[in-house]
């Protein structure tokens, strides 16, 4: 640790404006800004509303994601959206670790196994037939599957749609407060917690063992379920839409035995969490770069997954690359370290279950624009029109 660092180090940076810095290109096209910055080196500076440093090599990722005491979530970009500025996502150490330990068992692969048959039934019922648009189809399917997994299917569809719909809109829609909708959703979650489906995640949180030594308070359980719903919705539905689009072009990957590698590759090529952020709580040195306290520290799975020094032909869909090992901290579709996405097992289960019925279909791309754009998460620009024949 270095004491007394007061200013960000002199680092390369993409072209910006004298006063506004990088705010205009950040607002218009943040992906292009990141790509331009990456061409200046593996660590670069951005002049946003506060000094920011971006890195994307494994050693940077490891340092930022492993040290929870130095790099903290509160005050970072996740706090800009009311959908994410709550619950475990917005909790730092020393509270984070015990709360995470209490929540993790209810989101584990073992705990989720009891819902697999019900999720498969939902996927089969929404199996596309004829012409369909992948973004709309995946959004409806993932909403239903999250409702089953989290709440046993108890929440009203209309309320879920009203709460989740802004996440599909361009910024600033996901950043705007919606207190009435949030209160109605939280009331519905609280009612579900009072009498939960025994196979749902809500049942585990309601059982009183979601925190060591006492049980999770009702308001905290409601908050964590609301955040899990929002965080899992557009990330998983956008990934699913891309997966179906590319599955139509590469039928050899429809075999259920091949799907895991295919999904790994879709998650690499299109990481929904395209950018992660922390606030430096104290002066530090990361990958040889001094990082003063108060700096906005950014890591980018989007840049890491597109780094040709880590991934050969990174812009191609090549699932077979996952038959070999990858360098540690080079694959971050769900983040990494102690704050790895709590819903990683649920997301993978939903994706695999949603795609399995399509192995029996003849899929064809009709027309669409799969290019990536960003809101809170990475998403296809769309639309993505396909045709499914049985």
Question: What is each of the regions a protein language model found here?
Answer:
Residues 54:
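Sensory beta-strand/linker motifs that couple input domains to effectors
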């Amino acid at each position: 640790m270095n004491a007394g660092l007061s200013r960000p180090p002199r680092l390369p940076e993409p072209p910006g404006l004298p006063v506004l810095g990088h705010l205009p290109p950040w607002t218009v096209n943040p992906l292009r800004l990141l790509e331009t910055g990456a061409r200046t080196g593996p660590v670069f500076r951005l002049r946003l509303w506060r000094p920011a440093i971006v890195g994307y090599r494994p050693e940077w990722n490891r340092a930022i994601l492993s040290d929870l005491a130095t790099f903290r979530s509160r005050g970072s970009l996740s706090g800009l959206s009311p959908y994410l500025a709550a619950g475990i996502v917005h909790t730092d150490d020393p509270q984070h670790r015990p709360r995470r330990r209490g929540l993790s068992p209810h989101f584990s692969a073992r705990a989720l196994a009891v819902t697999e048959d019900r999720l498969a039934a939902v996927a089969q019922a929404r199996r596309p037939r004829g012409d369909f648009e992948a973004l709309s189809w995946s959004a409806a399917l993932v909403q239903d599957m999250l409702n089953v997994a989290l709440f046993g299917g108890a929440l009203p569809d209309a309320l879920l749609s009203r709460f989740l719909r802004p996440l599909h809109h361009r910024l600033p829609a996901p950043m705007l407060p919606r207190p009435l909708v949030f209160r109605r959703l939280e009331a519905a979650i609280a009612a579900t917690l009072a009498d939960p489906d025994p196979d749902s995640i809500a049942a585990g949180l309601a059982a009183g063992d979601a925190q060591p030594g006492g049980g999770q308070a009702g308001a905290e359980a409601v908050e964590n379920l609301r955040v899990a719903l929002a965080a899992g919705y557009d990330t998983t539905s956008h990934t699913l839409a891309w997966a179906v689009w590319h599955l139509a072009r590469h039928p050899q990957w429809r075999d259920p035995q091949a799907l895991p590698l295919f999904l790994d590759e879709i998650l690499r090529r299109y990481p929904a969490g395209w950018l992660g952020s922390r606030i430096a709580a104290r002066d530090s040195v990361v990958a040889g770069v001094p990082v003063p306290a108060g700096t906005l520290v950014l890591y980018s799975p989007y840049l890491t997954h597109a780094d040709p020094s880590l991934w050969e032909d990174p812009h191609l869909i090549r699932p077979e690359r996952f038959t070999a090992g990858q360098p540690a901290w080079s694959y971050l579709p769900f983040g990494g370290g102690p704050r790895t996405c709590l819903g990683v097992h649920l997301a993978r289960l939903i994706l695999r279950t949603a795609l399995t019925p399509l192995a029996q279909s003849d899929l064809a791309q009709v027309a669409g624009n799969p290019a990536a754009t960003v809101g809170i998460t990475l998403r296809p620009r769309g639309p993505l029109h396909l045709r499914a024949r049985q």
